[in-house]
Amino acid sequence: MSLGAVDEGTAELLERFGFDAEEFDELRAQVASGALSAASNVVSGVVGPPAPEDVVALPEPGSDAWREGHEAGLEALAAGRVAQVVLAGGMATRFGGVVKGVVEALDGRSFLGWKLGETGRLGTDLGVRIPVALMTSFATDAGTRAHVAGLEVDEPLWFSQRISLRLTGEGQIFEEEGRASAYAPGHGDLLETIRASGTLAALRGRGVEHVAVSNVDNLGARLDPVVVGAHLVSGRPMTTEVARKEGDMGGAPARVDGRLGLLEGPEFPAHFDQDRIPVFNTNTALFALDALDRAFDLRWLVVRKSVGGREAVQLEHLYHHASWELETTFLEVPRSGPRGRFFPIKEPVDLERSREGLREMLSASVLD
């Protein structure tokens, strides 16, 4: 596909944010042929729940395992060997078109203000500057940069996820008001763009050996020494946090033909009862930095979206599918309370509902 096939403004965005025309043409051909469809989302093979030993609980405070993890995590954080990566991309559609990271979350501070401020406070307590990297998108980059510039935090490293174009069900370019409709193709871009942008090399140059990845809207996913320590003690290159379901739907650890990894909701066969899996993915993870210095073969999922009252096709990939390529620890964490790690805010109503829980959690120090 030639960028000349789209309007000038969209073409500039595509060029700036890493549009891969060759890959796009290959993928749209697969949509047109039916090779990529809602049906292709479903994995082949025998799907079963994880074995009990596949999910490891975060150690209880005061236990020997807790002390071991706390000591290991504290040492790594104090030595500057752990960095934070915040996923601040997406399409900025759920808060009235405002970039979510800049929205006030609690007590006059934005999501980014809390997220970066908590990391800065931990670094101050430990006498170290903890590196932070922000992954934005074409829809959030300018607003996020402007907002962070006004915060009293250390300047983060910046990189962006890529950009793509929505399709019709027949594989043609989907248009809005006569223009090609662009979107951000999922946080799976993290695994490619952290390398391609030079961010991975920059983190390595600062002595970083592990990165903690979390959504900008989940203030519970703080850098906690015990969680970092659990990742280190496991000796595995990837740790994915899961939480007990409370009516939640979404991705979860599963076994496919005996292999353990994380499946997204649409990947489960219709006949499989997802309630057989008691935990779900919180989209928070830790990686050994060296494990990210490679290419990943992530699946593309077909997602149908209503855009301007019409159905559009988006192709998205997800970073937690790296669990099929890297040996992974599935770590069950508390979702609420002072050590709670799952406070997702997807809509404004979620924010109103969660404020007291957030206040309780944020008032507790991860060092206690």
Predicted regions and their residues:
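Domain-scale recognition of functional cores that engage charged ligands
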Residues: 58-86, 96-320
